Amino acid sequence: MRLILCVSLFVVLGCSSTIQPSKTIKKEEIVFNTISKGTLFGNGIEGILEEKFTIKNEKQWQVFLNKINSVNSVSSSFSEININFSNHIIICVFDTIRNTGCYAIEIERVFVEKKNLNVVYKKKEPGPMEMVTTIITQPYHIVKIEKRGEDHKFINKN
């Protein structure tokens, strides 16, 4: 019995693992501040399609503000308007124009991986039994992060 136990122990301890240790890719989470999250009600007149983009300078920001305010004064509800673009960039996600309410879009996470800035967002739609308003809407989410020099990629979590 001892012989079987010793042989079994020798076999188990003597075997080397063929599993290679995986290289872990370091992900750096980026803190973001929401500038605004809500819905446009301009029936697309603002000229903002279903888009995901970044704003990296004051000129782009002013063009964007003029666009988003073309129907309603949307930027009046922004948490901040004066952005220091030498230190920050703006990330925007806009859903498609919808025929009803109860839709939403949200940036959930921003992280850097392999020198790429990754923006993870999620869309929400009404359930099959949920009562919705009959109004044309376009959900959006706008956030500010510290300036990063990396390329950016948008990832739809749905």
Task: Enumerate the language-model features and the residues they cover.
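Sec-dependent N-terminal signal peptides
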Residues: 4-13
